[in-house]
Amino acid sequence: MRDNTIGSLIWLRLIRFTNQSNQMSNEFLKRFDLTTAQFDVLLQIRTYQPLTQMELAEKVTVTQGGISRMLTRLEKEGYIVRKQDWKTKTISLTEQGEAALERALPEQLAFQSSFFDDVLNEEEQKILYELMTKVHKHSEKKELPKE
């Protein structure tokens, strides 16, 4: 462990937390017949609809190929509709998709929040949020080191 910097230890913690919380969220969302990725996609569609597949892919953590397969499945389940407007195909929620999201949303948000509410007070959560926002913004501009 002596070779690890505090930065690399933080990075490892974040990866482990993300993996564990995603696994738990996937298990939790089974009661709503959704995965974490589907929940995120439905939430992003509701927030920004109508939007294109490319716009959606920029907002979620699913690959372009993965988003295409997921949208096909969500469309078959009646949760979304894709409309062709001249050259652009847009995605929107159906009433059924809105209802599915409304069933899951309050409980999933409470579950997600519990990861932090159970161990951090409000001030600690604000500080963590500010620090994570700062790191995230930096990561968006980060470039790979030169070889």
UniProtKB/Swiss-Prot annotation:
SMART domains: HTH_MARR. GO terms for molecular function: DNA binding; DNA-binding transcription factor activity. Residues 53-76 bind DNA. InterPro entries: ArsR-like_HTH, HTH_MarR-typ, WH-like_DNA-bd_sf, WH_DNA-bd_sf. Residues 1-137 form the HTH marR-type domain. Induction: Up-regulated following infection of host macrophages. Pfam families: MarR. Keywords: DNA-binding, Transcription, Transcription regulation. It comes from the Bacteria. Deletion results in virulence attenuation. PANTHER family: TRANSCRIPTIONAL REGULATOR, MARR, TRANSCRIPTIONAL REPRESSOR OF EMRAB OPERON. This is Uncharacterized HTH-type transcriptional regulator BA_1941/GBAA_1941/BAS1801.
